[in-house]
């Protein structure tokens, strides 16, 4: 089997029709037609010799065809069974294909392979969950190059006091340097999505902001963002009722020791503020 013309919507549609395949909206399937952008993304990923690369949502191989030329070891994840069979016919000698939901498969695969780099056009319904799950699990890739809906990209890069700043912003920027590569217009995809996308590169930080208890840091950060319009004080009081040993902590004293204004909201705090707050809390528990 030969690869189709990945630059042509008509050629891709014909390729699918001839093999009884079709696109599934529920999986957010959109193929990137722009050959210049495809090449740019692989160049930015820049895997080194001997490194394992993951591709998330390989489709019928537009990015895979480039990755096999630029990586020694490649694993692709694909949920669509028809596409899985196609990938195996096109690239079987060079690629490990894992069938299924990457959210369910990645942890076991990472334990086996220790991947360094990840590339993927991530659908809206899994983008934040996949990136968030890997970070929360302590698995940090050397580099990730992802294409996501622009809304997700804005959340990943947002800074304190900006509209899209959230727990997810803190989570991503805690472990990665996050940079926007470019916005990607709907016309660059087939089928055309109804939203603008964004390509980003996440590079593992050389010096990660350290905290005494990473799990507590994440828990405190998530708690403070759980009700965005509430103050730090009120969110901590809510947390206090649920946390074992929380009753022994004076919220006002905690904020004072951490140098945090108890009247502030989570969206006003920096990563270092959350770390200071969680470290101070750990000392008081």
From Swiss-Prot:
Name the SUPFAM superfamilies for this protein.
Answer: S-adenosyl-L-methionine-dependent methyltransferases
Cellular component (GO) terms are: cytosol
Q: What SMART domains does the annotation carry? A: rADc (SM00650)
Q: Which Pfam families match?
A: RrnaAD
* Major place of residence: cytoplasm
The EC number(s) attached to this protein equal 2.1.1.182
Q: Which UniProt keywords apply?
A: Cytoplasm, Methyltransferase, RNA-binding, rRNA processing, S-adenosyl-L-methionine, Transferase
The catalytic activity, as recorded, is:
adenosine(1518)/adenosine(1519) in 16S rRNA + 4 S-adenosyl-L-methionine = N(6)-dimethyladenosine(1518)/N(6)-dimethyladenosine(1519) in 16S rRNA + 4 S-adenosyl-L-homocysteine + 4 H(+)
| Key word S-adenosyl-L-methionine present | yes
EC top class named in words? transferase
- Indicate whether Transit peptide appears among the record's keywords: no
Q: Which residues bind S-adenosyl-L-methionine?
A: 30, 32, 57, 78, 101, 121
Record's superkingdom? Bacteria
**One annotated GO molecular function:** 16S rRNA (adenine(1518)-N(6)/adenine(1519)-N(6))-dimethyltransferase activity
Q: Where in the cell is it found?
A: Cytoplasm
Role: Specifically dimethylates two adjacent adenosines (A1518 and A1519) in the loop of a conserved hairpin near the 3'-end of 16S rRNA in the 30S particle. May play a critical role in biogenesis of 30S subunits.
What family does the database annotate?
Belongs to the class I-like SAM-binding methyltransferase superfamily. rRNA adenine N(6)-methyltransferase family. RsmA subfamily.
Q: Protein name, please?
A: Ribosomal RNA small subunit methyltransferase A
Q: What is the lineage of its organism?
A: Bacteria, Pseudomonadati, Spirochaetota, Spirochaetia, Spirochaetales
């Amino acid at each position: 089997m030969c690869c189709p013309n990945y630059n042509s919507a008509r050629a891709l549609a014909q390729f699918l029709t001839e093999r009884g395949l079709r696109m599934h909206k529920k999986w957010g399937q959109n193929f990137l037609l722009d050959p210049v952008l495809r090449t740019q993304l692989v160049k930015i990923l820049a895997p080194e010799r001997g490194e394992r690369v993951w591709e998330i949502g390989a489709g019928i191989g537009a990015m895979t065809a480039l990755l096999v030329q630029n990586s020694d070891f490649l694993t692709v994840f694909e949920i669509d069974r028809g596409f899985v069979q196609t990938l195996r016919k096109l690239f079987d000698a060079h690629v490990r294909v894992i069938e299924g939901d990457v959210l369910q498969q990645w942890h076991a695969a990472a334990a086996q392979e220790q991947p360094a780099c990840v590339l993927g056009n991530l659908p809206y319904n899994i983008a934040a969950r996949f990136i968030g799950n890997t970070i929360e699990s302590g698995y940090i890739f050397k580099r990730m190059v992802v294409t996501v809906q622009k809304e997700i990209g804005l959340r990943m890069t947002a800074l304190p006091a900006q509209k899209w700043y959230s727990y997810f912003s803190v989570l991503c920027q805690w472990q990665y340097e996050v940079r926007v590569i470019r916005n990607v217009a709907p016309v660059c995809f087939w089928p055309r999505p109804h939203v603008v996308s964004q390509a980003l590169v996440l590079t593992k930080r050389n010096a990660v902001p350290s905290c005494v208890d990473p799990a507590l840091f994440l828990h405190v950060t998530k708690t403070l963002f759980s009700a965005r319009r509430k103050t730090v004080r009120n969110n901590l009081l809510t947390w206090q009722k649920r946390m074992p040993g929380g009753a022994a902590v004076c919220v006002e004293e905690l904020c004072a020791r951490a140098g945090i204004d108890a009247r502030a909201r989570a969206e006003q705090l920096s990563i270092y503020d959350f770390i200071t707050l969680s470290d101070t809390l750990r000392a008081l528990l």
